[in-house]
Each structure stands twice: as C-alpha cells, then as structure tokens.
Amino acid sequence: MIKLKDLLVERIDYQDTAKMLVKHYGLRSKVKFGRVKGSNEADYDWVKDIINLKRSYPNVKEFIVSVLHEIDHAKMRKKMGARKYEHEYVMAGEEAEQKGGDFHDDNKYEEQAEQWAQDEYRRKWKQKFR
C-alpha cells in the first residue's frame, strides 16, 4: 500500500531533480509544481523565468523530457533576452497560424525545444534515470 509519506518523498525527488537539471545547464530559473496552463506537460513563464511542472507524471522519462523541454526555452530566453525571445516566439506562432497550424503546437520554437529535449534525454540522461 502506498503511504502519504512515500508520495511526498517522490515529489521532493522530482523537485530536487528538476532543480539539479536547471543548475546543470547554467540557469537560474525557478521550478514550481502544479501551475501548468492548459493540457501541457509543463510550461515556461519567460517573464518571471519560472518553469511550471505538473504535480505528477506517468513515468520518469516524461518528467525529464518535460523539464528539458522547458530548459531549452529558458536557454533561448537567456541567449536572446526576454523581450526579443517573446517577440520571436510570438512571430513564429503567428506564422504557424497563417500556415493553418496551431500557435503553440506548430511553433518552430516548440518543435525545436521538443527535439532538443528528446535528443538530450537519449544522449545524456537516459542511463542516469532508469
């Protein structure tokens, strides 16, 4: 039987793991759980530099890939600056809509972040988080 204490320990491990990954990539982004907008696995608030994650994930791989995806957004924000990143992201979303796609799902920055997260997980983290 699963005890409440075991569930709390798992959440703390997720929190620590997410913070460790953020630090590993040289970022200062904050990590918060339970504030994800819509049906996304996670989201990144580039104004406040906060990575928001769901409270639970079906498996560790989805959790790590979600964190890595948002880390890629944070890296782009750090590289471009908050204003330029927001401008470029919105322009890419509008371009996707003009082509008949979705602002978020067909955004080139979302596709790039997802590809980087999948590649980075396979290349670097898969063996460490089994």
Where do the model's predicted regions map?
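Proteolytic processing junctions in secreted/extracellular precursors
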Residues: 4-11
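Zn2+-dependent metallopeptidase catalytic core
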Residues: 11-29
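Post-HEXXH active-site segment of zinc metalloproteases
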Residues: 61-65, 77-111, 115
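Short helix/loop segments within enzyme catalytic domains
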Residues: 103, 117-130
